Structure formats: C-alpha cells, structure tokens
C-alpha cells in the first residue's frame, strides 16, 4: 500500500505467529517482512527496507528461528498447541503454537513524500504449518507537529501537518526582547 506521512517518522504495532513453533524452529524458518520503499531522509532511497526487525538489532528479521523460547525469548509467547497448557489463556486465543509479543516497526521518513509498504509472509519449505501477522488496529502512526504557546494564560496548541507554512508573531518585551524556539525535545530550533 502507498501512504504519505504527516511527519518525519512512521510506526505501527504487530505480532507474528506461527504453527511452526516449537517443533520446527530448527527445520523450517518461516519469516516475514514489512518492506518500505521511498525517499530515505539520510540520503538515497529505501529499496524494500525490512522494518520487521528484532528490537535492539540493526537488521535481524523477525522469524521463528530468530524469536523463540531460546533466541530473543523476551519477545516470544509459547501458546502450546493452542488447546493444552501452557496456551495463552487470554480470551482472544489463537491456534498458532507461538507468537511474538507486540512489536513496533518504525522508520524515519520525509514528511509529505510518497512511500510504499509491502507485507510478505514466507512459509518456508513446507506448506503444512501456517504463519501470520496481526496488525494492531489504528496503530499506523505518523504524528503531526504540535506547537504550543505556554507563555500566558491564553495557551494553545496547534497541530501542524508537514509542508504547512505558519507565521509566529511575538508581541511585548520591547526592542530588548530575545525569543528562542524549541522543539518538543527542548532542542533549539
């Protein structure tokens, strides 16, 4: 799908699940990816850059081989066979024998440019045991810029989309007044 971000970052939450867990972790390696294409703010272009990577790694993809009860186990939930212990007792039980904890895919983007994301599930070698991805509803996020005037009793916050021109006018203070603008992280703009 194509999208146009409203800020300089995008993110969304997902869970990867598979019936390959745990019996086939070493035999078959079902994997998936969220592949981003479009302008890279650091220069050049993203060309099918995988956003589905294990947190804290540079480019290790989320797969049954890389996330399980031994590897990156902090991100793994054992669901047994889906019917017997230690299955997840949550009322939203699924048949997958294991799945990841909710993970977040994120990327730096150029506000206002067009991007493309391709979602791919690779059911490696066998077709008997399924794997799937669950996207959290409403989690695809590209925040708008918030500008706040907190200098007086009449404070306001303006949500500004990218490529929007605004004029800020400061009144008072006389000729000796010195104004500085900071972003939400208190960096001087």
Question: Regions from the language model: what does each represent?
Answer:
Residues 3-11, 112-114:
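Extended extracellular/luminal ectodomain segments enriched in beta-structured repeat modules
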Residues 8-10, 164-168:
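Structural beta-strand segments of beta-rich domains
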Residues 14-24:
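Short amphipathic, basic-aromatic surface patches that mediate peripheral association
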Residues 25-111:
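Exoplasmic/lumenal beta-rich domain surfaces
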Residues 111, 155-164:
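Short, solvent-exposed loop/linker segments at the N-terminal edge
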Residues 120-128:
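Short beta-strand-plus-loop segments that form exposed binding edges in beta-rich domains
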Residues 143-156:
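Proline-enriched interdomain boundary motifs that mark the N-terminal boundary
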Residues 167-189:
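Surface-exposed, flexible coil segments in extracellular/virion-facing regions
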């Amino acid at each position: 799908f194509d999208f146009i971000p409203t800020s300089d970052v995008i993110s969304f939450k997902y869970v990867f699940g598979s019936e390959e867990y745990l019996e086939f972790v070493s035999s078959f390696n079902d994997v998936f990816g969220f592949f981003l294409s479009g302008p890279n703010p650091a220069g050049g272009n993203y060309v099918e850059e995988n956003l589905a990577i294990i947190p804290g790694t540079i480019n290790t993809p989320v797969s049954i081989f890389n996330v399980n009860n031994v590897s990156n186990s902090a991100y793994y939930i054992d669901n047994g066979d889906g019917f017997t212990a230690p299955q997840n007792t949550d009322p939203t039980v699924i048949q997958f024998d294991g799945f990841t904890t909710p993970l977040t895919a994120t990327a730096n983007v150029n506000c206002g440019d067009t991007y493309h994301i391709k979602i791919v599930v690779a059911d490696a070698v066998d077709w008997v045991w399924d794997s799937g991805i669950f996207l959290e509803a409403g989690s695809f996020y590209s925040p708008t810029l918030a500008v706040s005037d907190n200098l007086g009793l009449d404070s306001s916050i303006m949500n500004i989309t990218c490529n929007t021109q605004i004029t800020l006018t400061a009144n008072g203070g006389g000729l000796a007044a010195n104004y500085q603008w900071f972003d939400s992280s208190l960096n001087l703009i």
